[in-house]
Amino acid sequence: MAASAARGAAALRRSINQPVAFVRRIPWTAASSQLKEHFAQFGHVRRCILPFDKETGFHRGLGWVQFSSEGGLRNALQQENHIIDGVKVQVHTRRPKLPQTSDDEKKDF
């Protein structure tokens, strides 16, 4: 299962221009299928990623939801309250990663 989650996370990183929501405070009782089911009401969900902690075996309480269209992401962001397993989760747009700068570029002297 960990290998498939790693492949899914890598696929999300490669899909920079895809509409992806970052979800925080996901209850440990929730599964990726529940996440997908909840967000499907806003638009077609391509995939959900819940990274797991190797030591505890539980997911980390955060995840990503990739929508098929920008409209699905927009609809999800417009909803004020997202309740999963009785817990209000936080939904944000995924911020693109900034290019890493080397130590030489950081020095300005």
From Swiss-Prot:
InterPro entries: Nucleotide-bd_a/b_plait_sf (IPR012677), RBD_domain_sf (IPR035979), RRM_dom (IPR000504), SLIRP/GR-RBP-like (IPR052462), SLIRP_RRM (IPR034152). The keyword Magnesium does not apply. It comes from Pongo abelii (Sumatran orangutan). This is SRA stem-loop-interacting RNA-binding protein, mitochondrial. GO terms for molecular function: RNA binding. It comes from the Eukaryota. Keywords: Mitochondrion, Nucleus, Phosphoprotein, Repressor, RNA-binding, Transcription, Transcription regulation, Transit peptide. The lineage of its organism: Eukaryota, Metazoa, Chordata, Craniata, Vertebrata. The keyword Manganese does not apply. The modification Phosphoserine is found at residues 15, 102. It holds the Pfam family RRM_1. PROSITE patterns: RRM. SUPFAM superfamilies: RNA-binding domain, RBD. GO terms for cellular component: mitochondrion; nucleus. RNA-binding protein that acts as a nuclear receptor corepressor. Probably acts by binding the SRA RNA, and repressing the SRA-mediated nuclear receptor coactivation. Binds the STR7 loop of SRA RNA. Also able to repress glucocorticoid (GR), androgen (AR), thyroid (TR) and VDR-mediated transactivation. The modification Phosphothreonine is found at residue 101. It is found in: Mitochondrion; Nucleus. Residues 19-103 form the RRM domain.
